[in-house]
Amino acid sequence: MAITRSSLAICLILSLVTITTADYYSPSSPPVYKSPEHKPTLPSPVYTPPVYKPTLSPPVYTKPTIPPPVYTPPVYKHTPSPPVYTKPTIPPPVYTPPVYKPTLSPPVYTKPTIPPPVYTPPVYKPTPVYTKPTIPPPVYTPPVYKPTPSPPVYKKSPSYSSPPPPYVPKPTYTPTTKPYVPEILKAVDGIILCKNGYETYPILGAKIQIVCSDPASYGKSNTEVVIYSNPTDSKGYFHLSLTSIKDLAYCRVKLYLSPVETCKNPTNVNKGLTGVPLALYGYRFYPDKNLELFSVGPFYYTGPKAAPATPKY
């Protein structure tokens, strides 16, 4: 079949599209020139004119001829005449006189003939005669006394000597030994300082006293026990053991002595004058020494001049 012009034009357009859409990239090696190969030329296409098909005439639309409707008048059915209601003819009632039954004659009551009663006189029975029975008089028979039996004679049972009880030694009581509970030791420690003006330093050789009062009963004076501590060391530290006092509920710690002539006036800082109640004061327990240690103070002495107020610790 010969190639037409239209098909050739389409082939050229497709080739141009493929050329434009092709991916170009730079070759890694320089191109090698090859001599073009001459392909045999195709013969020129022979143009064949298109064959035109005959154009059909447009269809002619004609309205269908519809015959006009023929009017047929409706056929009216014959309406029946309304029914005529006639009353039924009831013949008049014919009166038939009642037939009377013959009347019965009333019954005739006749009294029955009762014979008259025949009187028979009653037969009287004689009244019985009651006679009292004769009861013989009782015959007294004296009682027969049975002989009283003699009291039984009891024989003494033979005495049997029981064997002596076996010897049972008395148990020896050994008192149970209570486990040893070490006594809890109690002690008081603290520091005594001197505050002279703005200078504060520990006092060597100062002492404190512990006053324990026993509350007396009514009308009796209470007794007091006073214990003095050893003199303080160079750091003003004191330590006093309370082994002789069992109850610390009524014990107070107070200042007692200062050997420094320029610092002998006790102050009430931390209750150095009124006394520290040990019952209301906490303690530290040392289990290795079995010791309850009450740490009080620090207490202060001052010189003749009034010292500035010292805060409580």
From Swiss-Prot:
Tissue specificity statement from the Swiss-Prot or TrEMBL entry: Exclusively expressed in roots, particularly in root hairs-containing regions, and especially in root hairs.
Cellular component annotations (GO), alphabetically ordered: extracellular region; plasmodesma
Induction and repression of expression: By 1-aminocyclo-propane-1-carboxylic acid (ACC) and a-naphthaleneacetic acid (alpha-NAA), ethylene and auxin precursors. Repressed by the ethylene inhibitor 1-a-(2-aminoethoxyvinyl)glycine (AVG). Lower levels in calcium-depleted conditions.
Residues annotated as signal peptide: 1-22
Residues in Sequence repeats: 30-34, 35-39, 40-43, 44-48, 49-53, 54-57, 58-62, 64-67, 68-72, 73-77, 82-86, 87-91, 92-96, 97-101, 102-105, 106-110, 111-115, 116-120, 121-125, 126-131, 132-136, 137-141, 142-146, 147-150, 151-155, 157-163, 164-168, 169-174, 175-181, 182-186, 187-229, 258-262, 266-270, 298-302, 308-312
Keyword Secreted attached: yes
Stretch list, region 35 X 5 AA approximate repeats: 27-312
One Pfam short name: Pollen_Ole_e_1
Subcellular location, record wording: Secreted, Cell wall
Major location category of this protein: secreted
One GO BP: trichoblast differentiation
Keywords: Cell wall, Repeat, Secreted, Signal
Family of the protein in this entry: Belongs to the plant proline-rich protein superfamily. ENOD12 family.
Function, as annotated: May contribute to cell wall structure in root hairs.
Protein name: Proline-rich protein 3
Organism: Arabidopsis thaliana (Mouse-ear cress)
Gene: PRP3
